[in-house]
C-alpha cells in the first residue's frame, strides 16, 4: 500500500532544517530507504520533506526503519505525520496543484515533484505503483495550471522576495546561488529596473547572462562587495551558512533567506540594522493575488478528481494482470502448436487448405471453450451474465 511519512506543515524553519536533505544526497537516501521499502520517492524542498513509499510492514516497524536509515532521532517523530492509501494519494495531488504550499499556488512545486520522481527513476527505487501515481500527478499538475491559467499570476518565494525589495525601493542586489531558485530570483530582478546585481556562485562559468549591470563573483570575492549592496537574496543548497555576521559591515541591509537549511548565520537575526526574512516569514508576506488565486484554484479542483479516479482504475486492473499474462501465454502456446504443424506439413499439403484448417482450428480453440463455459454457467443459473460478457468479446 502507498504510504506517506512527512514533516508537518506548521513547523518553524529552525526545526525543518534539522531534517533537510542536500539535493545531491536525495538519490543516496532513496537507495537506502529502498532497502526497507518495496519502492520509495523522496520529495525534499525548502518547505517540505515527504517520503512516499510502498510496504507491507506494520506502521511502527516501517517508520522506525525509515528513521534509522535517514539518521533521524525517533524522539522527533512528533514533528511528522503519517497517512496511507487514499489520504496519501490525495495529498500528493494537492501538493502538485499548489493547494498544500505555504505560498498558495506557487509555481515551483511541480518541477520539484518531477525532479524527485526522476531521481527515483534514475536510482531504480520506484516500482509500478509509484511510477504510475507520479506520472498521473505530474500530468494532473500540468493540466491544472494550464486550465486555471495560474501562469498569469505567478507566485513563488523568489517573486515575493523581489517584489518586497521593489516596494522598499532597493536597487542594488546580491544573489547567492544560481540553481532553480537563484536563477528565478535573477529573472525577476532583470524584469524590472535596477542598478547592480552581483551573483555569487561556486562556478562562475555557470552564469552566462550578458548585462553590464551584472557581475558574477566567487564566494571568496563576495565580502569585498558588501558595501555596494542594499539587498541580499540567498538560495544555495549549502548545508551551512554562507552569510556570516563577522563578515558583514555594520550598516543597513535587507536580507531574504530562501534556503533550508538557512544560508544566514543565526546571530545575524539579532542585528537591529538588518531586516531579515527567512522562508517562513516570506511565505507570510501579504500578497494581493492570494485571494484571487484561491478562487481560481477551488473552481478547478475537480481536475484532481479525474486523475485520482484514473489511478484507482489502474490499480483495479493490476489485480488481474497475472491472469492477463496467463491468457497471453496460452494464446502464444496455441499459436506455436499450429505454426509447428504448418512447418511440418507445408511441403506435403496444399498450403491454402492447410492454412485455412489451422486458422479454423485456432478460432475453434476459443469458440468451443466459450461454448463449454456458457453451458456450465447456464446450468448454475449464471448463463445470462456469462452470455453478456461473451457477446462483448465475440460480437461487435
From Swiss-Prot:
GO terms for biological process: protoporphyrinogen IX biosynthetic process from glutamate. It is an enzyme of class 1 (oxidoreductase). Pathway: Porphyrin-containing compound metabolism; protoporphyrin-IX biosynthesis; 5-aminolevulinate from L-glutamyl-tRNA(Glu): step 1/2. GO terms for molecular function: glutamyl-tRNA reductase activity; NADP binding. The active site is at 46 (nucleophile). It comes from the Bacteria. NADP(+) binds at residues 177-182. The keyword Zinc does not apply. InterPro entries: 4pyrrol_synth_GluRdtase, 4pyrrol_synth_GluRdtase_dimer, 4pyrrol_synth_GluRdtase_N, GluRdtase_CS, GluRdtase_N_sf, NAD(P)-bd_dom_sf, Shikm_DH/Glu-tRNA_Rdtase. Keywords: NADP, Oxidoreductase, Porphyrin biosynthesis. It holds the Pfam family Shikimate_DH. The record marks 91 as: Important for activity. It catalyses: (S)-4-amino-5-oxopentanoate + tRNA(Glu) + NADP(+) = L-glutamyl-tRNA(Glu) + NADPH + H(+). Its EC number is 1.2.1.70. Substrate binds at residues 45-48, 101, 106-108, 112. SUPFAM superfamilies: Glutamyl tRNA-reductase catalytic, N-terminal domain, NAD(P)-binding Rossmann-fold domains. Catalyzes the NADPH-dependent reduction of glutamyl-tRNA(Glu) to glutamate 1-semialdehyde (GSA). Possesses an unusual extended V-shaped dimeric structure with each monomer consisting of three distinct domains arranged along a curved 'spinal' alpha-helix. The N-terminal catalytic domain specifically recognizes the glutamate moiety of the substrate. The second domain is the NADPH-binding domain, and the third C-terminal domain is responsible for dimerization. Belongs to the glutamyl-tRNA reductase family. During catalysis, the active site Cys acts as a nucleophile attacking the alpha-carbonyl group of tRNA-bound glutamate with the formation of a thioester intermediate between enzyme and glutamate, and the concomitant release of tRNA(Glu). The thioester intermediate is finally reduced by direct hydride transfer from NADPH, to form the product GSA. This is Glutamyl-tRNA reductase.
Amino acid at each position: 500500500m502507498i504510504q506517506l511519512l512527512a514533516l508537518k506543515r506548521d513547523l518553524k524553519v529552525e526545526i525543518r532544517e534539522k531534517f533537510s536533505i542536500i539535493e545531491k544526497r536525495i538519490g543516496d537516501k532513496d537507495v537506502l530507504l529502498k532497502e526497507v521499502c518495496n519502492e520509495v520517492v523522496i520529495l525534499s524542498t525548502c518547505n517540505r520533506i515527504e517520503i512516499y513509499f510502498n510496504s507491507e510492514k506494520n506502521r511502527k516497524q516501517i517508520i522506525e526503519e525509515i528513521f534509522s536509515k535517514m539518521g533521524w532521532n525517533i524522539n522527533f517523530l512528533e514533528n511528522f505525520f503519517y497517512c496511507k492509501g487514499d489520504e496519501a494519494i490525495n495529498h500528493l495531488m494537492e501538493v502538485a496543484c499548489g493547494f498544500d504550499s505555504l505560498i498558495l499556488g506557487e509555481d515551483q512545486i511541480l518541477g520539484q515533484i518531477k525532479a524527485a520522481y526522476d531521481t527515483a527513476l534514475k536510482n531504480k527505487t520506484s516500482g509500478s505503483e509509484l511510477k504510475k501515481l507520479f506520472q498521473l500527478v505530474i500530468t494532473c499538475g500540468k493540466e491544472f495550471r494550464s486550465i486555471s491559467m495560474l501562469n498569469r499570476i505567478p507566485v513563488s518565494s523568489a517573486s515575493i522576495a523581489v517584489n518586497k525589495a521593489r516596494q522598499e525601493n532597493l536597487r542594488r542586489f546580491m544573489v547567492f546561488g544560481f540553481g532553480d531558485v537563484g536563477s528565478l530570483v535573477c529573472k525577476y530582478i532583470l524584469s524590472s529596473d535596477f542598478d547592480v546585481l552581483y551573483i555569487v556562485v561556486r562556478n562562475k562559468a555557470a552564469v552566462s547572462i550578458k548585462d553590464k549591470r551584472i557581475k558574477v563573483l566567487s564566494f571568496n570575492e563576495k565580502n569585498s562587495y558588501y558595501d555596494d549592496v542594499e539587498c541580499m537574496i540567498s538560495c544555495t543548497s549549502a548545508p551551512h551558512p554562507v552569510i556570516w555576521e563577522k563578515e558583514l559591515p555594520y550598516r543597513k541591509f535587507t536580507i531574504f533567506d530562501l534556503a533550508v537549511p538557512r544560508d544566514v548565520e543565526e546571530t545575524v537575526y539579532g542585528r537591529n540594522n538588518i531586516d531579515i526574512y527567512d522562508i517562513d516569514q516570506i511565505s507570510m508576506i501579504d500578497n494581493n493575488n492570494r485571494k484571487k488565486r484561491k478562487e481560481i484554484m477551488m473552481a478547478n479542483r475537480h481536475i484532481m478528481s479525474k486523475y485520482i479516479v484514473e489511478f484507482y482504475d489502474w490499480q483495479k486492473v493490476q489485480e488481474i494482470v497475472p491472469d492477463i499474462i496467463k491468457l497471453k501465454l496460452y494464446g502464444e502456446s496455441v499459436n506455436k502448436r499450429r505454426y509447428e504443424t504448418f512447418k511440418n506439413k507445408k511441403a506435403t499439403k496444399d498450403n491454402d487448405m492447410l492454412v485455412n484448417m489451422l486458422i479454423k482450428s485456432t478460432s475453434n480453440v476459443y469458440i468451443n471453450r466459450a461454448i463449454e463455459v456458457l453451458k456450465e454457467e447456464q446450468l448454475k443459473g449464471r448463463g445470462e451474465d456469462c452470455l453478456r460478457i461473451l457477446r462483448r468479446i465475440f460480437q461487435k
